[in-house]
């Protein structure tokens, strides 16, 4: 069974409880809600003999405690991925100290927010000023609703030279946002995460200049392998860093 949570932590918790009640052999989860919120449900699941593992966003405390019971992680080192993208994007976009960059992310979320914090730190280390906006719930679940917020941010800060969107859906929507703000493909440098077909189109069209590919297929595939290995052979949790490489128009 598969549950779609719209990237909403409260929905994830509700669906996780529902999944545990079905008593499957194993469950692969996202770590968006954080260790504290997920701990009681995971404890209940383990008492029922259900194997748990994570993908995309880690639960580092629980992973450390339950690794011998099959609790692994398939995903990027989030802070490092954000930090590396932030620095590389400044370089690729040709920004200088004192320039402004817009970072649109999820810094308030436990664990998941580390990627946004990393991106901000990477940009700031290069001497670039950050204008930050938190992605609201409605935009987090439906990137098409982000256009007014993007346009408003640029209206208030017309000297912003780069946008980093810490969200695959928002990164794919950068061309739409930029066109709505009246920007041509060479006016604002676009950066973000993941490598979907729309993002490839955005790179080829010039609206997206650099992304970091986190290999989401691997993030989804390996946790299922993990559950099989643990339920069948009792293997411990595996940790896989999927934050692979930067992608630009030069190597697409």
Regions found by a protein language model. Name each.
Residues 1, 26, 71-73, 99-108:
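Short beta-strand segments enriched in small/hydrophobic residues
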Residues 12, 72-99, 143-147, 194-199, ...:
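Hydrophobic alpha-helical segments within soluble ligand-binding/sensing domains
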Residues 6-10, 33-36, 58-62, 95, ...:
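Solvent-exposed loop/turn segments at secondary-structure junctions
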